[in-house]
A protein has these predicted regions:
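N-terminal Sec-pathway targeting helices
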Residues: 1-18
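Histidine-centered active-site loop/cap adjacent to the catalytic His
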Residues: 9-11, 22, 381-420
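Membrane-interface motif at the C-terminal end of an N-terminal transmembrane signal
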Residues: 19-36
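Generic structural signal for small/hydrophobic residues in well-ordered secondary structure
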Residues: 24, 103, 148, 164, ...
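Membrane/wall-proximal cationic-aromatic binding patches
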Residues: 35-128, 333-339, 348, 368-378, ...
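Conserved SGNH/GDSL esterase-like catalytic core that processes O-acyl groups on lipids
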Residues: 74-75, 88, 93, 97-99, ...
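Second-shell loop/turn segments in exported
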Residues: 104-110, 137-138, 279-283, 337-340, ...
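Serine-dependent acyl-ester chemistry module
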Residues: 169-359, 369-370, 416-417
Length: 420
């Protein structure tokens, strides 16, 4: 009796293994052809670079993030699917153009008039009188430094910027250093490379409330009237006003469980191992992509600048401490201590690189810390990593003060800007 039972169990186990193997193969195959599956199944840092024939082809590979003429908080996205006005091509003679790269912080999870890049353009126009300028917002949610490199390679010739601005979000553009130290066991390695596991985990997170752009409860889309061609940056319904107190602009956005998962992924970027070589190894791919961007920009005779956008975990020590206390209840993070974290780690790595590469850089973290102390008005949405309208204002003011010296043709300097 035992032999048939064992045989049955063996057959069942073999069937399960075979099913998992087939599933793994199908997911890997689907990830090659489907951008949506690839985004869910392949960690961003492990996605193989893809060759694109054009910038349009690259944008088409981001269908969940780049939606032409999308209604975004009652303002149209442009024809490329970016949160900006329509771009003038070719660039008008005499215009100073900035091409801004970044993720959802640059894209802006607020209405178009309130995004940091829209405000940056207005601020620079005010402090650089007589300068014809524009800021092209190429922020795309869910992207990283490797994507910024792709956009530079494919877009510089068409849009002809005088200055390329990289908006580096320390919360997820920085590498996951914690993983390099504490997740090298065989079991975790198997799960880490399994695309089937990653797809299932991320699909569940999406079902629980983690949305592509994190703009939960954004105002519903409105159909385009027949015969009307939408123009980026213009109101969908001029008679409709989206209140600054709309829950989609203030939060809470995510469930507590989903937001804890987001913050956990961010805090791992601030882990400081005892061996400095681990940090260097983790940062090598990121710095390699930044160097490739610098090389391409300089080859075309253009200028490059970098701004560091802080995570809320860097701005609010209490949030950082509370998250560590929560994580320590899990066996996976039982040994984690607040002393093992250095919230300035990404900033210091970038400062060293910028100095070595002779790139002008600004770290917005001190500005946000000061702004958090000067007013109780939130800089970040509740249960979301993204900025409120005030956070976008603070970022725009700081970047304008930084960039004025690079942009103003008359040599006029930006005024001192108090925290907003």
């Amino acid at each position: 009796m035992r032999t048939p039972a064992r045989s049955t169990l063996g057959i069942l186990a073999l069937g399960v293994v075979a099913a998992l193997a087939v599933g793994e193969g199908l997911v890997r195959l689907a990830a090659r052809w489907s951008p949506t599956v690839r985004d869910l199944a392949v960690p961003r840092g492990e996605r193989e670079p893809r060759a694109f024939a054009s910038l349009e082809a690259y944008l088409a590979s981001q269908p969940t993030q780049v939606v032409p003429h999308r209604n975004w908080f009652n303002y149209w996205n442009n024809a490329l699917g970016l949160n900006d006005v329509e771009f003038a091509v070719p660039k008008p003679p005499g215009r100073f153009r900035i091409l801004a790269l970044g993720d959802s912080f640059t894209y802006g999870l607020v209405p178009y008039p309130h995004t940091a890049m829209t405000l940056l353009e207005a601020r620079l126009g005010a402090v650089c009188p007589g300068t014809d300028l524009d800021v092209l917002n190429f922020g795309i949610g869910g992207t990283g430094v490797r994507d910024y490199r792709t956009i530079v390679t494919l877009g510089l010739a068409t849009y002809d910027p005088d200055l390329v601005l990289i908006n580096f979000y320390a919360g997820n553009d920085a590498p996951n250093v914690y993983q390099y130290v504490h997740e090298r066991s065989r079991f975790r390695t198997v799960l880490g490379v399994s695309r089937l596991w990653m797809l299932g985990r991320n699909a569940i997170r999406l079902w629980q409330g983690v949305h592509d752009l994190g703009a939960g409860r954004a105002p519903a889309a409105t159909d385009t009237p027949r015969g009307l061609v939408p123009r980026g940056g213009t109101p969908v319904d001029p008679g409709r006003h989206v209140s600054e107190q709309d829950p989609a602009l203030t939060g809470p956005i995510f469930t507590e469980t989903a937001f804890a998962a987001i913050q956990t992924e961010e805090i791992r970027r601030f882990y400081l191992p005892e061996n400095p070589a681990v940090v260097d190894r983790a940062w090598r791919p990121v710095l390699g992509d930044l160097e490739a961007i610098r090389t391409e920009v300089f080859r075309r005779g253009r200028r490059l600048a970098l701004a560091v956008y802080p995570s809320a975990l860097q701005v609010y020590p209490a949030q950082r401490a509370a998250l560590v206390e929560t994580l320590r209840r899990r066996p996976r993070y039982a040994a984690l201590s607040i002393d093992a974290l250095d919230p300035t780690l990404p900033n210091r790595q970038l400062a060293v690189y910028c100095q070595r590469a002779a790139i002008p850089c600004v770290d917005l973290t001190p500005v946000f810390i000061e702004a958090s102390r000067s007013s109780a008005e939130p800089l970040y949405k509740q249960r979301d990593a993204h900025w409120t309208i005030r956070g976008n204002r603070v970022a725009a003011d700081a970047e304008a003060a930084f960039l004025a010296g690079l942009v103003c043709s008359s040599g006029s300097q930006a005024p001192n800007v108090a925290p907003r």
